[in-house]
Design a protein with these regions (language model features):
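Bacterial N-terminal signal peptides that target proteins for export
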Residues: 1-9
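Bacterial N-terminal signal peptides
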Residues: 10-17
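Mature extracytoplasmic or otherwise solvent-exposed domains
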Residues: 24-172
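Generic N-terminal leader/processing signal
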Residues: 1-2, 16, 27
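N-terminal signal peptide c-region/cleavage motif recognized by signal peptidases
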Residues: 19-21
Length: 172
């Protein structure tokens, strides 16, 4: 009797353990990733998606170039450079005609903050607001989620180097 119970329990546990990687999307792969400016834009290709709907999320952080502006329109440089964060999402439909054999291109872009509170920006007083003119990106993370279950299928982190004209990000 105990042998049967242990056998059934073992089969049940093996079924759960074997099914977990399948539902977690362990076969999803990211390739050909390149980054460019606009905000921070990541383009690439995902494979191993099957026909599942997925969301591609980019989370990034960096140091802003800040100009303090008062209500009269006067401008002075900000005296502080706190790290700021931005993110963006792209939905990839499993029935999209661009998806072939479980493979899909993507292009996801951050939605950047435009302003920062005066005291964080190093502006002279509360009559000023910090306007973010540009962000020197330092870090980025691309995550892929199953749209129906929100399960994380893939995550890749990058170190970024930014100039006023270009950005280069390499996997950590």
């Amino acid at each position: 009797m105990n042998k049967k119970l242990y056998s059934l329990l073992s089969v049940f546990l093996m079924t759960i353990v074997m099914a977990a990687p399948v539902s977690a999307g362990g076969a999803v792969k990211l390739s050909g990733v390149s980054f460019r400016l606009g905000s921070l834009i990541a383009d690439g290709t995902l494979s191993g998606l099957g026909n599942a709907d997925v969301s591609v999320v980019i989370d990034a952080s960096g140091i802003p170039a800040i100009t303090c502006v008062n209500f009269g329109g006067n401008e002075v440089p900000g005296q502080s450079y706190p790290k700021v964060a931005a993110s963006g999402t792209q939905f990839l439909d499993g029935d999209s005609p661009v998806r072939k054999n479980g493979k899909s291109p993507f292009g996801v872009e951050t939605v950047d903050p435009e302003t920062i509170p005066w005291d964080e920006a190093g502006c002279p007083s509360s009559n000023w607001i910090g306007h973010i003119a540009f962000i020197f990106w330092e870090d980025a993370t691309i995550s892929v989620y199953d749209a129906s279950t929100q399960a994380l299928l893939l995550q890749r982190e990058y170190d970024c180097k930014t100039t006023l004209t270009s950005v280069s990000c390499t996997p950590k």
